[in-house]
Every structure is written in C-alpha cells, then in structure tokens.
C-alpha cells in the first residue's frame, strides 16, 4: 500500500501511544464491531467477580466504507482482505474519554502472507467509541454470563520509512 497522508497527527495523542519516529502511516481503517465480555471470578481475589475481556470481532473499513479486512481474537489479529495477517504485543494504553476503550499502541509481529500487512511494525487504536465492559453487575449469580458490547475505533498501521 502507498503511504497515506497523516489524518491523525501524533502531536495530539498521549505520549505513551505515539509511534516512534522513523515510521510512516501505510493504512488507515475504521473498525466497527463488537467486544465480548464474560463475568468471571477475579484473579487473586477469592469471592470477587469482574467482567473479563474475551475478545473482539470487527470489520475494518476505509473512510469511504470499502471493506479492508477484519480484526478478531484472541490473539489480537488484523487480517487484510488479501489474506495477509498480523498479530502483536500491546506496548501501551492511554485513557480515552469516559465510556470508551483506551487508546492503544501495539508492536506488530512479522506478517503472515504477502499483502497489505507486510511491513507493518506498529498499530495504533485511536478515536475509540464504546467497547467498555458492560454496566450490568457481574456477581456470583451471573458468573459465566457473556455480554457483547458495540464499539468503533480507528486502527492506524505504521511501517518503517
């Protein structure tokens, strides 16, 4: 993919999720989908429960609505329409506005397959809307219950200059 004009200025983003210098934006997408949560026992806190992030399922679209690929997990996987895929490791998160997923910076693993994901080294999640754990109480009475919440986020894919 050719380099795109930078629609999201790095200067307006929190420092922890800024992409290191020496990288260019190669793909910009709007992820629209759902995140599944499950009411589970809280780790290292006997008798307590919490909503646990199970995984995402989203379509990645261009600004004009053209479908570019998908995002799913676990593990967190971005797949282009051409079949190329990447997974990654979260490096940092930063707060977004109330009721929205945090911003995120992910270090990409080498792509599987040749295509749009080849050469991607970082993924940013910004402009988040929704996606946080359900407001429904998670208690011993509904342990094991799954809830699905809608979300939207911009996913920005970066490669070395």
Predicted features by range, described:
Residues 1-3:
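Bacterial N-terminal signal peptides
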Residues 5-9:
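Boundary at the C-terminal end of the N-terminal hydrophobic targeting segment
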Residues 10-36, 43-161:
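Primary mode marks residue(s) on the alpha4-beta5-alpha5 output face of response regulator receiver
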């Amino acid at each position: 993919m050719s380099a795109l004009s930078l629609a999201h200025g790095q200067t307006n983003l929190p420092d922890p999720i800024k992409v290191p210098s020496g990288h260019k934006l190669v793909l910009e997408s709007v992820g629209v989908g759902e995140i599944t949560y499950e009411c589970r026992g809280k780790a290292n806190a006997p008798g307590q429960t919490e909503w646990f992030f199970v995984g995402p399922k989203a379509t990645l679209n261009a600004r004009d609505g053209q479908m570019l690929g998908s995002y799913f997990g676990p593990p967190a996987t971005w797949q282009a329409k051409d079949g190329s895929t990447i997974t990654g490791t979260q490096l940092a998160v930063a707060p977004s506005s109330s009721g929205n997923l945090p911003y995120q910076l992910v270090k990409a693993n080498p792509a599987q397959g040749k295509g749009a994901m080849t050469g991607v080294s970082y993924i940013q999640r910004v402009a988040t809307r929704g996606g946080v754990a359900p407001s429904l109480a998670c208690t011993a009475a509904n342990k094991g219950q799954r809830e699905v919440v809608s979300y939207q986020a911009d996913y920005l894919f970066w490669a070395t200059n």
